Amino acid sequence: NYIGKEGGDGYDYEDKITARVRLGLDAKVNKTTSVKARITTGSIELGDSSKEAQANWDLAYVEHKFGKNVVVDAGRYTQKFGGGLIYSSNFDGVGATAKLGDKVTLNGAYGYMTAGRFAKTSKADNGDVGLINANVAVNDRFGFGGMFAHVGTTNVRMGNGKKNNEFDNVYGFNAKYNIGKFGIDGEWVKASGLSDSDIWNVGVKWGDYKINKKNSWAIRLDYFDQAKNAPVFKTQKYESNDLLKKTRYEGYKAWQLGASYAPEKNIGINAY
């Protein structure tokens, strides 16, 4: 993964190359139940030996299927909030996904976020989350969805520089359209408990990148508009100055250009 940044706020950022290895495990208990886990090295910056890379279990959960249309996950699994703009990572709790016919999918979850801004957060400082996602596939090209979540009180530093944020209810909408290798998507999210708390994103892509498909590739251009109190629970790539505690916490407006390529099956190269 190659990262290059130019500071627009008076700070300069060095280019760097990072690498990460993940190993997924899937043990089937019976026809309807599986135990799944994943080992990861975390992000390693090439040329920097000051930080020791240690493998750890970042996912471990049980997956059970009730018939063909209902799946339940319990443990530490990957949970998406809406289209993934504000969070799509590790989640400790229980989630259920149900398909209603060929077009409608419902997802509900309860638990705790444990990655992004919530990485290395104690349970006392974390807040529980109740979440509902709904998605509708209108046809093979167009789909849209909505999300609603209630976020408990947390003691975790967010993009506005504050630790105690009463986001309360978080809701949003997303949509996507694809035709051939071209795709466009967008999402808008807001928190009811704080003013100046919306975030939206529009992205376009060209290609059909899949990490399990050799020689597949894609390029993508995104625009982000993040208000200072937006409920962004993952760490966005454009927030480097925030993570270095050198920002004025006024929100972000950013363009992001990225590319992905799979030289071999299950090997991916990403640059942005």
Could you describe each region identified by the protein language model?
Residues 1-73, 94-108, 124, 132-140, ...:
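Beta-barrel outer-membrane channel/assembly domains of diderm bacteria
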Residues 53-54, 91-93, 236-240:
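Flexible, surface-exposed loop regions and adjacent strand-edge segments
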Residues 205-213:
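Small/polar residue-rich beta-strand/coil "junction" motifs that cap repeat-based extracellular fibers
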Residues 86-88:
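Active-site cleft segment of glycoside hydrolase catalytic domains centered on the general acid/base Glu
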Residues 112-145, 150-152:
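Solenoidal tandem-repeat scaffolds enriched in leucines and small polar residues
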Residues 2-7, 40-49, 76-84, 111-121, ...:
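Sequence/structural signature of outer-membrane beta-barrel proteins
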Residues 132-134, 144-149, 153, 157-159, ...:
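Outer membrane beta-barrel transmembrane domains
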